[in-house]
Amino acid sequence: MAFDYKKEYKEFYMPKAKPSIVTVPKMNYIAVRGKGNPNDENGEYKASIGLLYGIAFTIKMSYKGNHKIDGYFEYVVPPLEGFWWQDGVQGIDYSRKEEFHFISVIRLPDFVTKADFDWAVAEATRKKKTDFSLVEFFSYDEGECVQCMHIGSYDNEPATVAMMHDFAEQNGYEVDITETRYHHEIYLSDPRRCDVSKLKTVVRHPIKRKVV
């Protein structure tokens, strides 16, 4: 059985549809940075997804070639995720999608080193004849957060976010979105193949203890 991060780390990928507090450890990701409306067919966000998966599957299938990764085991590619922010906005304003900045990411298994990642970028560039220069090895220590499973349209997330913020406040926390701590979404459904009303998205916000 291939290792499935969603099943093995349910506390990060499969929270309930009610808010909870979680401490997220440092993880490494394949990442692409960009800006603009994520719904634009020819925009930077849609392009980033193809780049991420190009590297993700090059690493996943590496065991079939000459590049052997130390400690490799078969695994399911983790879900697509995104860190989002807007300049001059506290939190997220869903009515101003064209002002989004993002870091689009896919988690890397812990056994993948920076050297393995660099090999994958070179290999994917050679095989796919595509420019992967925007792809980066991104380490991020997210820390303490409030999160919730959001079911439905992305545009309806504000109701879930409000519930999360209320929960955090009731438990002695305050939201801590900053220049280095972001609105975070983990996409468990493919919007091309799933009814909008059934889309599953983990929504996560950084928090810190309230100073009394």
Describe each PLM feature range.
Residues 1-212:
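A solvent-exposed interaction/effector surface
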